[in-house]
């Protein structure tokens, strides 16, 4: 397995940029769409050998019926999150059942998908993550995130951050083109 983490600090960022560009070209030659390649290479490019597997799994998952809905739900989640947001969820501040449900499902999926990502079963991880979409939809239908109560607002944003983090081991879904 090739990992940039194993290289000495003498390796220039230009070398990493060259390798990333080369990997981009290789994945494109394999027929993987540019937006999916960009999404995969935006996440943990240090693990070069895994980037191809993640891109292929993402391309296969794109052909699934619930891909577009999942990509739209992810965008909805990340669009509301402030840059660099890093608060932690406080379950004692939950007001609605939708908050509890989304937090619980995110925790369950995190445990399941971390195992699948470590096993490099990216397609199965994506299928499992897709299970959260109806709960995300329910959350947005029932919960006002940007409320005046700052603590409540931050807690709700923290729940959404947990959802966004589910994707972080595979791809940056915000880079994926989705038909309207």
Feature locations, PLM:
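Positively charged, low-complexity/disordered segments
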Residues: 1-11
């Amino acid at each position: 397995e090739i990992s940039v983490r194993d290289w000495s600090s003498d390796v220039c960022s230009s070398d990493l940029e060259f390798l990333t560009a080369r990997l981009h070209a290789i994945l494109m030659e394999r027929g993987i769409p540019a937006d999916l390649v960009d999404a995969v290479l935006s996440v943990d490019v240090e693990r070069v050998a895994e980037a191809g597997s993640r891109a292929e799994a993402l391309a296969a998952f794109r052909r699934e019926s619930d891909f577009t809905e999942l990509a739209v739900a992810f965008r909805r989640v990340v669009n509301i999150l402030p840059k660099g947001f890093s608060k932690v969820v406080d379950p004692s501040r939950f007001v609605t059942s939708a908050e509890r449900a989304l937090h619980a499902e995110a925790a369950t999926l995190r445990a399941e998908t971390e195992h699948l990502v470590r096993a490099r079963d990216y397609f199965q991880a994506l299928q499992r993550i897709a299970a959260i979409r109806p709960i995300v939809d329910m959350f947005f239908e029932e919960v006002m995130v940007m409320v005046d109560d700052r603590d409540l607002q931050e807690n709700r944003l923290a729940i959404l951050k947990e959802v966004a983090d589910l994707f972080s081991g595979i791809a940056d879904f915000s880079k994926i083109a989705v038909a309207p």
